[in-house]
């Protein structure tokens, strides 16, 4: 067996062993793949390897990149239904099978459930049988038997559309490698940084290492009999029998700075352990307490400013916040006022980007086939205020002032006020004409409008994007990707695609950007 398992606590040297293996494979021109959980990890390890001139032949990917490589080498050519199109299909099926409109959260959870059923190789018939048995044993309140029917309808719809989903394609590719192991070619694969491993990831590890016999290295932060690692015990128990080699690393305190070593090493060794002793922490662990959220953030900002003044690099400082409960806008305001350089990794809606806000506003200004427009004054202004759209941005401010004085709170009444003094807003008419021609035409026009909005402030300038413009580029990429998926859906199943500009605006508003 070609699977090498490396386990140990945090900071025990697992990364060092994995990267040494990457360097060794690269030196022998074996073209290794290093698989890490996040895009930030991809960029970090690419920089580290590039600094050592070890990037030739080395690929650093997220797990999705590994699956794409497996699909390519296995020769699985089925087209995949995009994530947004899949959600539209599931929403339609849920409405029919469950007799209720399902919200975005439910649809995402349903998509994840069906994906896990795929990776566990549970067919619709098997699910229906299990749910029926549950229903017979425990009564109507115990089982959601309609989920089995929904899964079966989903499978039938994919066949009708001539598409598969991501999990289905991945499982077919892994099955192809099991049948013909030589398709992989023997490239080494190394996993590092995963807190835990999902079923599909374990399946890929077993297929590559045990069936294909490719060199596979898996690093897992784990120690037996430690409370902090109890949640990973099941994953370890699945990996251990597959491993031909298992290296257990001992804890190492030298990773920590000398002045913090005693406290932080003790914290790592004692975390969640009952009856752990207390040690003096010195200045390694400090509590900052403010009279309110802003005061607390100001204390954090002052602490960071002190560290920067002492010569610490900004990229070596991390600030962790609660996913819910911390006002991100307040954090940005406080750090900006303190001149703290920072980047914020968070999910945000498509409309947070200037071009996303402008496009959704523009779409809401388009009259429905009935002739009614639900767009508000703010939607029209969001479009007109897109960077570069107006050579004189103050014209939008003037329109807002006149509209509010006239009581024109919707786009229908505000538009004539604009056109009394300025040019006709024909873009709205072009979108309405596209809407009348059908979903495909509407989506094509919306995609072009999004691109023009991105280009508006950059016309006649062959310039590189500044760092603060990368968010807009990300919004452009995400928006065009979503519109392309919807355009494909409009070609395959027009009844599932957004039929009106207003509906399309709602779909785009649900897109999340990550930075």
What are these regions (language model features)?
Residues 1-47, 184-186, 190, 195-372:
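Conserved motor-region signature of P-loop NTPase helicases/translocases
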Residues 2-5, 94-193, 200, 204, ...:
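Accessory N-terminal region flanking or inserted into the helicase ATPase core
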Residues 28-142, 152:
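Conserved P-loop NTPase-based nucleic-acid remodeling module centered on helicase motor cores
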Residues 28-30, 52-56, 73-82, 95-104, ...:
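Short, polar/flexible loop-turn hinges at active-site or ligand-entry regions and domain interfaces
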Residues 52-59, 66, 70, 96-98, ...:
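ATPase/helicase motor core of nucleic-acid motors
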Residues 59-66, 188-197, 201, 323-325, ...:
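Conserved helicase core region in the C-terminal RecA-like lobe
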Residues 111-122, 176-177, 321-330, 387-388, ...:
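Core structural elements
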Residues 141, 145, 154-157, 281-284, ...:
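Accessory C-terminal helicase-associated subdomains
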């Amino acid at each position: 067996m070609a699977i090498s398992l490396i386990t140990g606590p945090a900071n025990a040297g697992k990364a060092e062993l994995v990267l040494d293996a990457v360097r060794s494979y690269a030196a022998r021109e074996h073209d290794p793949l290093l698989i890490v959980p996040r895009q930030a990890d991809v960029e970090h390890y690419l920089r580290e390897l590039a600094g050592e001139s070890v990037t030739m032949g080395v690929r650093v990917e997220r797990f999705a990149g590994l699956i794409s490589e497996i699909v390519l080498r296995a020769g699985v050519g089925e087209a995949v239904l995009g994530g947004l199109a899949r959600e539209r299909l599931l929403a339609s099926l849920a409405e029919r099978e469950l007799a209720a409109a399902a919200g975005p959260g439910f649809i995402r959870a349903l998509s994840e459930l069906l994906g896990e059923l795929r990776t566990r190789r549970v067919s619709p018939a098997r699910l229906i049988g299990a749910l029926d048995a549950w229903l017979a044993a425990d009564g109507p309140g115990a089982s959601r038997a309609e989920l089995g029917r929904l899964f079966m309808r989903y499978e039938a719809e994919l066949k009708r559309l001539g598409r598969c989903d991501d999990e289905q394609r991945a499982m077919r590719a892994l099955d192809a490698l099991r049948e013909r192991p030589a398709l992989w070619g023997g490239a080494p694969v190394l996993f590092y940084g995963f807190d835990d491993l999902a079923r599909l990831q374990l399946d890929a590890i077993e297929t590559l290492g045990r069936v294909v016999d490719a060199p596979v290295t898996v690093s897992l932060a784990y120690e037996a009999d430690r409370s902090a690692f109890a949640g990973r015990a099941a994953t370890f128990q699945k990996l251990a029998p597959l491993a031909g080699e298992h290296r257990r690393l001992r804890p190492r305190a030298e990773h920590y700075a000398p002045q913090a070593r005693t406290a932080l090493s003790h914290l790592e060794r004692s975390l969640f352990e009952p009856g752990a002793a207390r040690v003096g922490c010195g200045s390694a662990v400090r509590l900052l307490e403010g009279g309110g959220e802003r005061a607390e953030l100001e204390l954090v900002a002052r602490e960071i400013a002190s560290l920067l003044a002492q010569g610490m690099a900004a990229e070596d400082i991390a600030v962790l916040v609660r996913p819910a409960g911390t006002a991100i806008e307040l954090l940005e305001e406080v750090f900006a006022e303190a001149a703290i350089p920072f980047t914020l990794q968070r999910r945000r809606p498509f409309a947070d980007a200037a071009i996303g806000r402008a496009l959704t506003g523009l779409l809401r200004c388009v009259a429905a086939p009935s002739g009614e427009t639900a767009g508000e004054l703010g939607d029209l202004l969001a479009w007109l205020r897109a960077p570069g759209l107006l050579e004189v941005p103050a014209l939008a401010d003037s329109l807002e002032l006149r509209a509010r004085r006239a009581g024109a709170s919707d786009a229908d009444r505000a538009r004539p006020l604009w056109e009394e003094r300025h040019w006709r807003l024909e873009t709205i008419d072009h979108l309405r004409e596209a809407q009348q021609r059908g979903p495909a035409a509407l989506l094509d026009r919306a995609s072009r409008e999004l691109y023009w909005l991105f280009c508006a402030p950059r016309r006649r300038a062959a310039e590189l994007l500044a760092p603060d413009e990368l968010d807009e580029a990300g919004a452009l990429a995400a928006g065009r990707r979503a519109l392309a998926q919807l355009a494909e859906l409009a070609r395959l199943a027009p009844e599932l695609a957004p039929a009106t500009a207003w509906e399309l605006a709602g779909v785009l508003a649900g897109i999340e950007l990550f930075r």
